[in-house]
Each structure stands twice: as C-alpha cells, then as structure tokens.
C-alpha cells in the first residue's frame, strides 16, 4: 500500500512537471505562427499552420481564429476577413493573444495598426464599397474593438464618397436616403441632392405618369433643399411636361365622351399647385371643352319647361352657344 501511495506521488509530480512543459510547447507553436505571419513568411506560416495538432488548435481556438483572419487580411486581402477581424480580435484579446505577442516581442498595437491599414486598403479597392463599409462599421460597433477616432473617420469618409459615387453613377432612392440619414450635413450634400433631383426628372421624362409627377413635385427633401436656392433644376421642364400630360389626358377623355371626368380633370388643370399661371399653356384650348362638358352635364337636368331656367343661366355664363 505504501508503494502504491509512493507511485501516486511520483506520478503526480511528473504530471505537475510535464503539464507546464506541454502547454509551453503549444504556446511556442502559436508564437512561431505569429512570427512567420508578422514577417510575411507565407511558406513557413502555411507549413506550421497545417502541422498544428488538434489539442493546440482546440486550446488556442480563439487566438488561432485571429491569426487565420490576419493571414487572410495581409496575404489574401479578403473582404470577409475584414468584417470578421474585429470580433475575432476581441475574443483573442480576452485569451492569450497579448501574451503570445509579448513572448515574440511584437507590439499588440502594431498588429492592430497593420490590420486596420489592410482593412482600409481592401475597402478602398472594393467594388461594393457601400454594403462593405456598412458591414465593417457595424462590426466595430457590435464589438469592444478599440478603434480610434482617426480610423472611424477614415471609414466614414470612404463610405460618404462611395455613396456620392453611387448617386452619380446609378442613383437610387435607397442610396439617397442613406446619405441623408448618415450625412445630413455631409461634404457632398449638394451633389447628392442634385443627383436625386435629376433622377426624379428622368423618371418623369421617361414615363410621364401621375405617380412620377407627384414624386417630383411633392418630394419633401427636394423642397427643403431648394427652398433657399434661386431655382430648382428641371422644374420648368417638368412643369411643361405636366402641362402637356394633363392636356393630352383631357383630350383622350373628350374623345371618350366622359363629361364628368373631363370636368374634373379640367378643374384639376386650372387649380393644380404644380403649375404656375405661366405654365398653363392650354387654357384657351380648354375653354370650349370645359363649356361643352358643362353642357353635357346639364342635359340630364333639362326634363321639362320649368328646368329651362337652368339652360338660361347656362347661356348667360358660357361663351359658346352652339
């Protein structure tokens, strides 16, 4: 029994002695990976990464995930890695990553700076800057990553320029509203509003419909922006298009003989806030159609001699007697 106790003690001492050595070996492998990565030695990085045993990968899973992301950032310029980096950094920092850096005499701040510069480089070269920049910014906000104000401002500047370029090349309501929401006093607010105004005009020009005219005239953001300006570009052109649009609609209704609809649209034409007095170029043309529509509406009411007074009143107030 004494011998069994003695052996147990010996075994315990061996374990106490061996465990730190094993852990030191595992950490040493991680330190080498960081060194190869930091020194841009891609071949040694890849070979040692592939040889890493399962136990080391499991124990240092968070640190290894960060090293993999750094490899993808620095050597593969991966956009996905750029969005994954911030979360991976936070988890690895809570683990042993700072210790691994200290052992290799690599400044943690240098690792961060290099990663951030890589992300900026990848973002600037991206073909999808708008969604990509949003993903990067959201990733920073959702983690405790210690991003400084300089980097955050750089990201915002890149995103703002990307939104402007989007409005100039392929303007959409979504891009416009995003810019207004994120940069209400942005550097490019004038260009962005001008691009949206042009988009609204081109919609009307291509498809002169009631909905498109309403979108141009009733756009609150456009009204607010151009309120203090000398004039709104394309306003005269759109008024001219709307003037012709209403007149053509009246003409088509007249051919159908729908007096009620004609009367309504003529009233709309005369009183619409979208047109100035000078922009209503068809008033003379509509006078006859207007009185004709009134007469057609009057006809059903003239049923006997007593209702002839209605006709008399009509003749007193209307020019066209035929």
Positions of PLM-derived features:
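Conserved small-residue packing positions in alpha-helical repeats and bundles
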Residues: 33-36, 65, 69-70, 118-124, ...
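N-terminal, post-signal-peptide region of Sec/Tat-exported proteins
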Residues: 42-75, 101, 199
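Short solvent-exposed coil/turn linkers within tandem alpha-helical repeat scaffolds
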Residues: 51-61, 89-110, 137-155, 180-191, ...
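Bacterial N-terminal signal peptides that target proteins for export
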Residues: 1-9
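Sec/Tat signal peptide C-region and signal peptidase I cleavage site
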Residues: 19-24
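Bacterial N-terminal signal peptides
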Residues: 8-17
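Fold-core signature of tandem repeat domains
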Residues: 155, 163, 167, 176-183, ...
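Helix-turn-helix repeat elements of alpha-solenoid scaffolds
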Residues: 37-49, 75-95, 127-135, 169-174, ...
């Amino acid at each position: 029994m004494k011998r069994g106790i003695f052996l147990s003690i010996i075994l315990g001492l061996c374990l106490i002695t061996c465990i730190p050595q094993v852990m030191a070996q595992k950490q040493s492998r991680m330190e080498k990976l960081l060194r190869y990565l930091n020194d841009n030695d891609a071949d040694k990085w890849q070979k040692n990464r592939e040889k890493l045993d399962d136990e080391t990968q499991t124990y240092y899973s968070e640190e290894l995930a960060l090293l993999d992301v750094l490899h993808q950032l620095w050597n593969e310029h991966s956009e996905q890695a750029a969005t994954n980096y911030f979360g991976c950094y936070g988890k690895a920092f809570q683990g042993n990553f700072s210790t691994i850096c200290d052992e290799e005499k690599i400044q943690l701040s240098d690792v961060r700076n290099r990663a951030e510069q890589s992300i900026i480089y990848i973002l600037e070269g991206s073909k999808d800057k708008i969604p990509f920049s949003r993903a990067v910014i959201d990733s920073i906000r959702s983690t405790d990553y210690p991003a400084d104000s300089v980097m955050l401002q750089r990201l915002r500047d890149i995103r703002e320029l990307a939104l402007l370029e989007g409005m100039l090349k392929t303007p959409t309501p979504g891009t416009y509203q995003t810019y207004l929401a994120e940069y209400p006093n942005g550097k490019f607010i004038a260009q962005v509003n001008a691009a949206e105004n042009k988009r609204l005009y081109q919609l009307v020009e291509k498809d002169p419909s009631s909905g498109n005219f309403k979108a141009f005239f009733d756009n609150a953001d456009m009204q607010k922006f151009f309120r203090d300006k000398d004039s709104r570009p394309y306003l005269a052109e759109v008024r001219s298009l709307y003037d012709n649009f209403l007149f053509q609609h009246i003409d088509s209704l007249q051919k159908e003989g729908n007096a009620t609809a004609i009367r309504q649209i003529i009233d709309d034409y005369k009183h619409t806030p979208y047109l100035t007095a000078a922009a209503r170029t068809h008033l003379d043309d509509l006078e006859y159609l207007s009185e004709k529509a009134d007469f057609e509406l009057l006809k059903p009411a003239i049923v006997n001699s007593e209702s002839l007074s209605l006709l008399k009143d009509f003749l007193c107030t209307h020019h066209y007697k035929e």
